[in-house]
């Protein structure tokens, strides 16, 4: 899989999402639960806004000094016996991982959940050279078996219910029991354990990399990442270049923010800090590789969108977004969905494929309020729209013509006067009472769901002319 998960046009994807009543119900229920849990976990601290400000300061400081911390991380990983590779592009990252697999003559690879490995199409790259790649995260495993893309950053199989999952297992894996979650989990555990023991390479993502220790932090609910790191002889960790913290002290703050914002817990079930195996350690890989992926991030870092790199992938913004609630994750056409996806995806994938995403927002600001590191997401969405129109020249033709006509009319007193006089008569076939009941052309999309006032028969200039200052007519 790559970052792009669908070849359908944006409007078609949205249409599919709106028609999927189960998906919308599942998303609504999950959003409500995760939102409520997040508020409770935040309230336990008593000073949530101060924690958010501290998180923002840590992320901004790290990004401002990213070159220094990346170099420090590289030096410390190397001192501990690991190998570090800086990949400028997703192709370079995938090629390096391929080369490691070829060198090890690996045929079986097991991996934990990782967005950046999806971004660089790692699974496809390994399959090209004959490797079998197994997802060990339960949600990702379900989707892999069903050849279905993820719909949520932290809950990738959110759009499926347990009956659908049972049917997938029955059809693809020969599962014969009920749709009881315990029974299905027990079945998957048996499937995965056998694969774990045979895998030559384990691949993980990285929630945070600690610069001054050369270690990585992984946060999971299932413990699968721990097995990926400890059983295979070779481990490859893949991280976006921005996923840095200076020391363990900053890590402590960000992990607390991440867990509370993502699932409403003080800590998730497993928080692991590890790296290359040391002499006194029993468990761990004999060989460790860290792949640091740029893939456009350095360009973002030097742009007006740099604040998006503060993201810690908690999905709090996704869990409060009213647009996501109604259209679902697949509508975004990217592994990154919701408000963060609408900002990040066009930067990584370009406007050619993702120019509609910045408009997939009501600009209500709920995402900005929910973000634990205070990314101004709705402002960045507006900035995208500005770039699309002013720099990219990608505004739809109808919008360009409408704006040009409005500009001509509004800048000419004679045209404006004539237009305001003719408007009531011109719009009368489309009005009912004092409201426009059916719009013309693109306006139909507005009037179908919103009330639009009809032009007044008495213009303000006429009313003003007929009234004396401070008196009546």
Swiss-Prot record:
UniProt xrefs under Pfam families: Fer4_8, LUD_dom, LutB_C
Which keywords belong to this entry?
Answer: 4Fe-4S, Electron transport, Iron, Iron-sulfur, Metal-binding, Repeat, Transport
Extract the SUPFAM superfamilies matched here.
Answer: alpha-helical ferredoxin (SSF46548), NagB/RpiA/CoA transferase-like (SSF100950)
Q: Which domain of life is it from?
A: Bacteria
Outline the extent of the 4Fe-4S ferredoxin-type domain: 302-332, 351-380
Record family assignment: Belongs to the LutB/YkgF family.
Q: What does this protein do?
A: Is involved in L-lactate degradation and allows cells to grow with lactate as the sole carbon source. Has probably a role as an electron transporter during oxidation of L-lactate.
Looking up HAMAP family in the UniProt record yields: LutB
Q: What is this protein called?
A: Lactate utilization protein B
Q: Which organism is it from?
A: Bacillus anthracis
């Amino acid at each position: 899989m790559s970052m792009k998960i669908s070849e359908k046009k944006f409007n078609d994807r949205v249409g599919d999402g709106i028609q999927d009543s189960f998906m919308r119900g599942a998303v609504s229920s999950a959003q409500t639960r995760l939102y409520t849990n997040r508020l409770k976990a935040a309230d336990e601290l008593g000073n949530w806004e101060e924690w958010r400000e501290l998180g923002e300061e840590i992320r901004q400081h790290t990004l401002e000094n990213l070159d220094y911390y990346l170099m420090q991380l590289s030096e410390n990983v190397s001192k501990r016996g690991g190998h570090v590779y800086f990949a400028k592009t997703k192709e370079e990252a995938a090629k390096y991982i391929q080369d490691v697999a070829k060198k090890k003559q690996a045929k079986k690879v097991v991996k934990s959940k990782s967005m950046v490995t999806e971004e660089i199409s790692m699974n496809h790259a390994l399959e090209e050279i004959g490797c079998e790649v197994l997802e060990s995260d339960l949600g990702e495993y379900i989707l892999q078996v069903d050849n279905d893309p993820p719909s949520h950053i932290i809950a990738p199989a959110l759009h499926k219910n347990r009956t659908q999952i049972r049917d997938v297992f029955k059809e693809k894996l020969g599962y014969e029991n009920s749709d009881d979650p315990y029974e299905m989990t027990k079945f998957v555990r048996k499937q995965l354990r056998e694969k774990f023991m045979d895998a030559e390479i384990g691949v993980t993502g990285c929630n945070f990399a600690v610069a001054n220790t050369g270690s990585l932090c992984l946060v999971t609910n299932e413990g699968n990442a721990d097995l990926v790191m400890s059983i295979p002889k070779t481990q490859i960790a893949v991280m976006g270049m921005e996923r840095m913290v200076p020391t363990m002290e900053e890590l402590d703050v960000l992990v607390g923010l991440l867990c509370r914002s993502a699932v409403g817990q003080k800590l998730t079930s497993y928080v692991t800090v590890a790296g290359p195996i040391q002499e006194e350690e029993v468990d761990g890989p004999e060989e460790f590789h860290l792949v640091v992926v740029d893939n456009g991030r350095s360009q973002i870092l030097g742009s007006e969108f740099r604040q998006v790199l503060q993201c810690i992938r908690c999905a709090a913004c996704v869990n409060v977004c009213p647009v996501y609630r109604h259209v679902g994750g697949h509508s975004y056409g990217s592994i990154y969905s919701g408000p963060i996806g609408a900002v990040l995806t066009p930067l990584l994938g370009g406007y050619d494929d993702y120019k509609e995403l910045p408009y997939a927002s009501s600009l209500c600001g709920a995402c900005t309020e929910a973000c634990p590191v205070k990314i101004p997401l709705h402002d960045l969405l507006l900035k995208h729209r500005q770039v699309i129109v002013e720099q990219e020249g990608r505004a739809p033709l109808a919008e360009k013509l409408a704006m040009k006509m409005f500009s001509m009319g509004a800048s000419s007193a004679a045209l404006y006067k004539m237009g305001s006089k003719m408007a009531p008569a011109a719009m009368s076939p489309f009005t009912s009472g004092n409201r426009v009941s059916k719009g013309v052309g693109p306006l139909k999309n507005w009037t179908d769901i919103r009330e639009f006032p009809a032009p007044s028969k008495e213009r303000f200039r006429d009313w003003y002319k007929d009234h004396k200052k401070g008196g009546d007519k």
